Amino acid sequence: MSAEDLEAQEDELLALASIYDADEFRKAESVQGGETRIYLDLPQNFKIFVSGNSNESLQNSGFEYTICFLPPLVLNFELPPDYPSSSPPSFTLSGKWLSPTQLSALCKHLDNLWEEHRGRVVLFAWMQFLKEETLTYLNIVSPFELKMGSQKKVQRRATAQASSSTELGVGGAAAADVDQEETVDERAVQDVESLSSLIQEILDFNQARQTKCFNSKLFLCSICFCEKLGSDCMYFLECKHVYCKACLKDYFEIQIKDGQVKCLNCPEPQCPSVATPGQVKELVEADLFARYDRLLLQSTLDLMADVVYCPRPCCQLPVMQEPGGTMAICSSCNFAFCTLCRLTYHGLSPCKVTAEKLIDLRNEYLQADEATKRFLEQRYGKRVIQKALEEMESKDWLEKNSKSCPCCGTPIQKLDGCNKMTCTGCMQYFCWICMGSLSRANPYRHFTDSESPCFNRLFHAVDINGDMWEDEIEEDDDDEDDDDD
């Protein structure tokens, strides 16, 4: 490495660290490289939707979601010794909501930008392009259709390229032929398992970012007329009127102490919005909330005995249940639940007991009379009651259901997705298969290096439904079959 290249690399990394905060840029510790997260600015009222003929697509089709934020594009890069004088940075570009074909188009444009900047540093130009021009370059408009690319197909392509490179050398004729046939760049990674998980991740990320933005803004409370940060405020879900938590706390406490539990409306005159039980619970003391909950339930039952509340924390709207039945369907979120246990409706099967309620159920059963015991056995099932009596506590849960981060030891549970994991404690990347730490500059090299024990196992042991893949991938398979003929 020449002194000029080393100085240019150090200056560029230092400049990026000063321009972007820690959430957007992180320098690798062991190599000249790092990771950038590109958060795109979306137009107002940007909508996403799903369509298709697979079972998973049909379950989500017909719904449009208005969002303000999308998960970031992640650019992992490593600077070679002769950068920027001769060679470009090696990189991978990953994203959850762009298909492999779209990510490949971005990778190709990054290559073109390097050609334009050859001999000069290019990382800032790459980041600016991804942040400001991605939507325009890919012709993405609202409503935007979410798509999935075939990870199995991508893995087969990576295997073919690796074998071709091994036989003829990197850049050989066979490798060049493979590159010409493929439309998906091996540097493009759509790190999401399925459309259903993709939609949920987008909605969760959008809610988290909206909360973060709300908490960082200043709002004028219409009660005390003081400006306060959003983290010290709360807004009513229906009308979006904002008040400071201190004023709402006093307002709620006075109403609850007076028994006016149905009068927790928005303080704005003539506004019909009502605080949710979750909002009330957040502000008032536990004993006062217990009084509120009891009075609210009692007043509701006095007026209409067949009304229950949706158990979802984000909804909690009143729901009518059918006479003589135990099933109720929320008209707002369409959640079907059992009116006894407040969990997903389970038909004639006994109510399930969560781990948190096992101890309470055991104590209640031991202190109950014979009639109450028979009722509990009928509601939860005798087997569940017996299990609650036998189990004193849920020990060894972490050992059976989680693995420890190789860096900080934080217990991590894998729900779904690929085998490239991120520790929620120290943000270290690691492999779920071998539990080895991964490079921040290029965490996917562990799965693409033919010498690695986890080569081509990014989605190992993940149940992937082949019906969800794009028609363009199926057409590629048909073309390959025709070529074989």
From Swiss-Prot:
Query: Which reaction(s) are listed as its catalytic activity?
Result: [E2 ubiquitin-conjugating enzyme]-S-ubiquitinyl-L-cysteine + [acceptor protein]-L-lysine = [E2 ubiquitin-conjugating enzyme]-L-cysteine + [acceptor protein]-N(6)-ubiquitinyl-L-lysine
Cytoplasm found in the keyword field: yes
Annotated RING-type zinc fingers sit at: 221-271, 405-434
Q: Which residues bind Zn(2+) 4?
A: 338, 341, 346, 351
Query: Which one of the record's GO molecular function terms can you name?
Result: ubiquitin protein ligase activity
Start and end of every RWD domain?
Answer: 11-137
User: What PROSITE patterns is this protein classified in?
Assistant: RWD (PS50908), TRIAD (PS51873), ZF_RING_1 (PS00518), ZF_RING_2 (PS50089)
Region described as TRIAD supradomain: spans on this chain: 217-458
**Residues binding Zn(2+) 1, per UniProt:** 221, 224, 244, 247
The EC code for this enzyme is 2.3.2.31
Q: In which pathway does it act?
A: Protein modification; protein ubiquitination
Positions of modified residues (Phosphoserine): 349
* Zinc finger residue ranges, IBR-type: 290-351
Binding annotation for Zn(2+) 2: 239, 241, 266, 271
Q: Which residues bind Zn(2+) 6?
A: 431, 434, 446, 454
Asked if the Swiss-Prot or TrEMBL record annotates the protein with the keyword Nuclease, the reply is no
Processing and modification events after translation: RING-type zinc finger-dependent and UBE2E2-dependent autoubiquitination.
**Record text about domains:** The N-terminal destruction box (D-box) acts as a recognition signal for degradation via the ubiquitin-proteasome pathway. Members of the RBR family are atypical E3 ligases. They interact with the E2 conjugating enzyme UBE2L3 and function like HECT-type E3 enzymes: they bind E2s via the first RING domain, but require an obligate trans-thiolation step during the ubiquitin transfer, requiring a conserved cysteine residue in the second RING domain.
Describe the task this protein carries out: E3 ubiquitin-protein ligase that plays a key role in the RNF14-RNF25 translation quality control pathway, a pathway that takes place when a ribosome has stalled during translation, and which promotes ubiquitination and degradation of translation factors on stalled ribosomes. Recruited to stalled ribosomes by the ribosome collision sensor GCN1 and mediates 'Lys-6'-linked ubiquitination of target proteins, leading to their degradation. Mediates ubiquitination of EEF1A1/eEF1A and ETF1/eRF1 translation factors on stalled ribosomes, leading to their degradation.
State what protein this is by name: E3 ubiquitin-protein ligase RNF14
